[in-house]
Amino acid sequence: MSSNNRVFEETLDIKYIDKDLKVFDKVQRCEGVTQDTKLYISMDINSDIYPMKVGASYKLLLAKSIYESKQTPKYFEYELFSNTKNTLMDNFDYVMCGKVFQFSQDKKEKNDNSEIDTLSISISFGGLLFQISKLKRDDKTGKPKGFEDINLDETLYLLIKKISK
């Protein structure tokens, strides 16, 4: 898989589950901070299929394709899952396919007498939401740093694997 297919790869430590209010049965709103980049992530997970736990760590991968060596078909087709050997899904426990629907500006944060302008990316996985926050803005593109190749309405895959607790 070419490196440009891997949009984001990080370890997430879950800090809260359903912190505000439980709205839907069989859905958990999981919130946490990534270990290396210290980004804030909030995501909805189907808890019937893949329950997550506070204090546990999970490997997250956002990818443009589930295939190691070729691009995923642009439109959902039967062929997408008819030959699923040697895919990224082989190494993960939970996979969702969704669309980027929003880039937004976060509230300004104070850091050492200066304000930091941060951004968020929101992705919808069939109504289950995923948001990465506290991203720094790229001065050239105006998009979040490290996510310059992401566009609105782009299809992305979220792959998750539990790695501790």
Predicted regions and their residues:
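Mixed-charge, low-complexity intrinsically disordered regions
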Residues: M1-K99, S104-L119, F125-K165
